[in-house]
Amino acid sequence: MGAGERAAGGGGAQDPGAGCGSRALSALCLLLSVGSAAACLLLGAQAAALHGRVAALEQERELLRHAGPSGALAAWAETHLERLLREKLDGVAKLRTVREAPSECICPPGPPGRRGKPGRRGDPGPPGQSGRDGYPGPLGLDGKPGLPGPKGEKGTPGDFGPRGAQGQDGVAGPPGPPGPPGARGPPGDTGKDGPRGAQGPAGPRGEPGQDGEMGPKGPPGPKGEPGIPGKKGDDGMANQPGLPGPPGPKGEPGDVGPRGENGVDGIPGLKGEPGHPGVDGATGPRGAPGLKGEQGDTVVIDYDGRILDALKGPPGPQGAPGPPGIPGAKGELGLPGAPGIDGEKGPKGPKGDPGEPGPAGPKGETGEMGLSGLPGADGPKGEKGESASDHLQESLAQIIVEPGPPGPPGPPGPMGLQGIQGPKGLDGAKGEKGTSGERGPHGLPGPVGPPGLIGLPGTKGEKGRPGEPGLDGFPGPRGEKGDRSERGEKGERGVPGRKGVKGQKGEPGPPGLDQPCPVGPDGLPVPGCWHK
């Protein structure tokens, strides 16, 4: 076998695969060609149909254009009328003249059917003929007033009239408002003393005063009853000597002694009765009349009912403190004041009066020698003795050597100095409560103190009330009558007023005419026609 034959055998083995691929490709191309041809035919048919419809529409439009509007309207109306007539005939009840039934039916005729529904409303009919003219109506109402005319020209001024008679004085005008405050006038004369003021309230309780000086010794008291002998007290400590005793009776004038010390001031005497009031002084001379004030304004201002406040001027500056006044007269006895606050505890008072003698106790044992008793009462005046030094020595010798019987208790001496507190004694029986003493007289008024320092400026006071209206001033002189003024221009026409209230209904008019009256050129009946 040669090489050519092998090549031919190899080519025959590969042909079946290549043939299948070419056949599939050819079939696909054929399907696409058939689809495209069908689509072209479908589009051509649709385009032909659309073209025919457009041609028909154009032809119909041309026919309508050539037929004109009246023919088209008549054709449209004819079709609608036929349709409406057909609907109307269908709604009308149909009467059967001959019974439409087969010959073999022997049934009686049935009842007539019910009435049908009303048909549609028909088209409006043609307008009727115009009637004859009516009778003329009654007279109309008055027309509205016309617009105001233009302003007239200015008239010529009239002649001056005769001079009028002198008029009477007019009524005095109302009081004018208060004028400005005038200058401060000279100080007036001293006025009369005013009436005595009412009793003032009781003043506050004064502070306790300083201890006064020792007063003079009082008169000797009555002889006291002998007291109960007390227990022996402890020996006291040496203290300052006591105050001198009361002076004895006046003796014979002795030799001129040295000058004594100044005496103690006495207790102030009682307040004297108030004096009679003095006689009123004579009235001073009348001052010169002031200058005539200016004419006040006649405008009345109410000031909200506070005229007194309106007349008051603004408060002036604070004045300097005045000189101290004269001490006033003593007032009447005031009412007893309220009980004051309890004061501080005072110093220990003097020893009280001796109590009543108790029952006699058993005789005690002889005690030791007691203290020397108080000096006895003054004896009768003796004769003029010898010199004071010798008499004093003999008196002392008698007292020491020959002790006499104890004399009656003398008057209580002045309070001694504060001694050392002794042991606490036994409480005595409680005495009865004494009656309250009478109220002492009021002391004399003290001297007037020096004027105090100027106080701080006070706060601004409230607004004063308006003052009362002043008295009517004297009417001024009547002025001369002025010249007659020229006639003023004519005023403009006023604005028309509002529409008035509707009037009552008028009475019925006369009966109308049986036949028409001729009408004049103004549209109204000829005068005299309706009187016939």
Swiss-Prot record:
UniProt keyword list: Cell membrane, Collagen, Membrane, Repeat, Signal-anchor, Transmembrane, Transmembrane helix
Record membrane topology: Single-pass type II membrane protein
Compositionally biased residues, Basic and acidic residues: 342-354, 380-393, 427-441, 478-495
Domain of life where this protein originates: Eukaryota
Cellular compartments per GO CC: cell surface; collagen trimer; collagen-containing extracellular matrix; extracellular region; extracellular space; plasma membrane
Signal peptide boundaries: none
Residue span(s) of domain Collagen-like: 108-166, 173-232, 240-298, 313-372, 404-452, 455-514
Pfam families: Collagen
GO molecular function: heparin binding; identical protein binding
Transmembrane segments: 24-45
Compartments it resides in: Cell membrane
Biased composition (Low complexity): 129-145, 196-207
Keyword Cell membrane: yes
Maturation and modification: Undergoes proteolytic cleavage by furin protease to yield a 60 kDa soluble form that forms a homotrimer and exhibits a low affinity interaction with heparin.
Residue ranges that the UniProt entry lists as topological domain Extracellular: 46-532
Cytoplasmic side: 1-23
Keyword Zinc-finger recorded: no
Bias-annotated ranges (Pro residues): 174-184, 314-326, 403-414
Region (Disordered) residue spans: 102-296, 308-532
Oligomer status and interactors: Homotrimer.
PANTHER family attached to this UniProt entry: COLLAGEN ALPHA-1(XXIII) CHAIN, SI:CH211-266K2.1
Protein name, as recorded: Collagen alpha-1(XXIII) chain
Gene: Col23a1
